[in-house]
Amino acid sequence: MRFSKEYTLSDLGICDSLIDLYKAADKKDLTYAGRVGGGSVMPEVKKSRDFFIEDAGPLGEPSDYKFDLYQEQLNGFIDSYLQSLTIHNQEFVMQRLPQIQYYKPGDGFYTWHVDASGSDGCDRAFVYITYLNDVPNGGTEFFYQEYTVEAKKGKTVIFPAGLTHKHRGVISEEHEKY
């Protein structure tokens, strides 16, 4: 059984709106250098510019950028994922709102890693990644599963955060990735 599952947003316009939100945040200097576990900036490990949705205050309401529609679909994906693993009546709490990560061509999360513990100190059971644009030769590679998720606009992948799902970014030398 594969413990990663892929889903697709029904409205791909959500992706465009979230990219617009990121760009607006970047213009207001609300983005920051991507961090790795422990909150360290280590560009030799991960090179990106990141933005937490919860910091969107100066940009208007997140719903202005279809974040509410994204959150609704994401919650449905998570429910479906948990049911597929026959994990019922479990309460999982999202500790923080999602972040948008931007990678220039050649940038990415270069090293194998797991996401069980975040830089904010929260313990994670599951990870989700939603690709906001198509990235040929981009995506996420899973070490033990010998499996690569393609970065397709609107695709969400959910997987366990622990050691069983060590992964890294597939670096595109030609394309940006959100």
Tell me the role of every PLM-derived stretch:
Residues 1-92:
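Non-heme Fe(II)/2-oxoglutarate
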Residues 65-178:
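Catalytic core of non-heme Fe(II) oxygenases with the double-stranded beta-helix
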